Structures are given as C-alpha cells and as structure tokens.
A protein has these predicted regions:
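C-terminal segment of N-terminal export signals and the immediately downstream linker at the start
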Residues: 26-30, 46-75
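Short linear capping/connector segments at secondary-structure termini
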Residues: 63-66, 95-100, 130-133
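Solvent-exposed, polar/charged alpha-helical surfaces in well-ordered, non-transmembrane soluble domains
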Residues: 78, 82-86, 109-114
Length: 193
C-alpha cells in the first residue's frame, strides 16, 4: 500500500494557521526560490541548495522632469539614469542620435542607443529593427527595452518609462509616468540587468 501522505503537496497538508498561510503563499510563488548552479553547489557543501530571488527593485525617484537612482541601485543604473536625464528637453528629430552621439534632437532608437552607449551597454547606435536582436529576450530585473521592430523602441528603468512618444506629438525623449499600449512590443534586456 502506497503512502498517501508522501504524495500530498505541502500546501495541502498544512493546518489553517497564519504561519501555514504564509508558507502556502511562499511555496506557491515559483520565483521565490530557484535551484541554480550555486544552489546545487550549496547542496554539495551542506546547504539547502536554494537561492533567494533578488528582492523587489526600488523604483526611481522622479520629480516630474528628471529621474534619480536610489543609492542601493547598481552603478550602471545610475549611469543609465544620468544619460537619460541629459536628453530630457531635447526635441524629437527623426534619425537624431544615430550619426552624432550628442545630437541636437533624438528619435526613439537614437535616444535609447545614446542612453545604453553612455552606460557602456552598446557600442554603436541601433535602429528599432536592430534592437529586436539586442541582448536577451524577455523583461529584465532593472532595465527592459520594449521593441516594435521597424516602428518604435522605448525603455523602462526600474519601472519608469523613458520614451519619445507621449501625449504631445513631436516631444523628444522624456520620463513618462502615463501608461501606454504594449501591443506589438517585444521585451528585451541587457545581460544581468
């Protein structure tokens, strides 16, 4: 006769207490603990073999015009934010930022290229089509580029959107708090970010 208790998921075998509810929530979240190569090495060394997922990322400070990274953010986030802040107030210019790093206006891909270049995450400007192959697919922990190949690209840094498209046609690169449609966009992210 088989042991039925061995086949019962831990979340079903817990009593109804506040502590049990906490365990149910933690076990139910797949991202809470991940078994990785370092976790496997930890098991060999006598550890549990699990690594905690990174903590929730703190949002950027935003004063309505400029963004500021928190002191706990990695240095590269500070570089990205500083580079993006330099472009705030520049006008939209089709093709801007592709031939000259410090142009007098920027389009969507030119502004994203400039920000990534200044943080040493890109070695040359890319078009929105080329960004479809940039770095890694999927959203990043700190930085996510949203690419609609051949049409538009924008980025989010710690949840704050840096984009050339907003409520007024012809606005250049700005930090945006208003939501926008993500239909047709594919997320990409720089490695480790």
């Amino acid at each position: 006769m088989e042991n039925q208790e061995a086949d019962t998921p831990i979340t079903e075998s817990l009593s109804d207490t506040p502590e049990a509810e906490c365990v149910r929530q933690l076990v139910g979240r797949r991202h809470w603990m991940k078994l990785g190569i370092w976790g496997a090495l930890g098991t060999i060394g006598g550890g549990l073999g699990y690594m905690m997922a990174p903590p929730a990322v703190l949002p950027l400070y935003f004063n309505g015009l400029y963004a500021f990274a928190h002191e706990s953010h990695p240095p590269v986030i500070h570089q990205l934010v500083a580079a993006a802040n330099e472009l705030v107030g520049k006008p939209y210019k089709w093709g801007g930022g592709h031939r000259v790093l410090f142009d007098n206006g920027f389009d969507c891909s030119g502004s994203v290229s400039h920000v990534l270049y200044r943080a040493q995450l890109l070695d040359r400007p890319l078009s929105s089509s080329a960004f479809a192959r940039y770095a890694w697919p999927g959203p990043g922990c700190y930085v996510t580029l949203f690419v609609n190949p051949g049409h538009h690209v924008f980025m989010q840094i710690c949840g704050l959107r840096f984009d050339t498209s907003g409520t007024v046609t012809g606005e250049g690169p700005r930090w945006r708090v208003a939501s926008r449609s993500y239909a047709g966009f594919y997320p990409r992210h720089p490695a480790w970010l």
